[in-house]
């Protein structure tokens, strides 16, 4: 898993893919700007490993100011990295809790300069494991059945969709918090308040073959490629050939919030995704969530219960299963 940062208007780009791109192929290596980036990375990694209790309540922007991190570190590494991870604009990332980010960086080996964990991908992507679940279970699936609302009738939960009412003993919500709030009854005020601890933001994604959003120097092409025109838009391009080990000759990319910059003749598909916006530490959100788990025989899980990734969704689903066993 490699990462590049590109500021075309400043003619500045770099990639942390390997020592070759960091040192030998990096024309900015001997610049003061790049030196400040490296010093900032070493300093942040050191402080993250200390992981003091006093960091917990600080917003990340306040933390970086408190410890006098350079603007170069923030602009050309840290905020682009976080913005890319959560597909959120930098002004929202600045309000993330320090402890939340530090825990994530530690768990994913991002505080190690060397010997970072080797990321692996599932062949055919998430389709593969969803199919596996379907094939191995005797669960009935109702596709394209939008749930409009639910009704609580004594010890039964009535699910209302477009065509009919269905009665169940238990209900597990495994979707986004904003969707859950729309489905819950109006008098579920406590549940809706707790679910509001995590918001969602819609992002545009585009599958295409346009190389213009990639770093100018091909040595800097990485799995994740952040590009900024000094605005607050979070633009990221995934190099799918490198990420998923595609063997085809043509390069394929998925870009976030960049539709207007992509050559229309090279667009394959446009998609809209929703990504979580975290306002609190994970531990606080989970503690509050415990207050409503099981009320009215309703349970909640999803990637938003962790850091917003597939593995977080799996862990939260396992936790809900333990409630029911």
Segments predicted by a language model, with ranges:
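Short, well-ordered alpha-helix to beta-strand connector turns
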Residues: 137, 168-169, 295-296
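A residue-level signal for conserved active-site and pocket-lining positions in enzyme catalytic cores
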Residues: 64, 82, 133, 208, ...
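Mobile amphipathic helical/loop "lid" adjacent to a hydrophobic cofactor/ligand pocket
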Residues: 1-103
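Helical element adjacent to the flavin cofactor pocket in flavoenzyme catalytic cores
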Residues: 101-161
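A structural signal for the hydrophobic beta-strands that form the central parallel beta-sheet
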Residues: 141-143, 173, 300
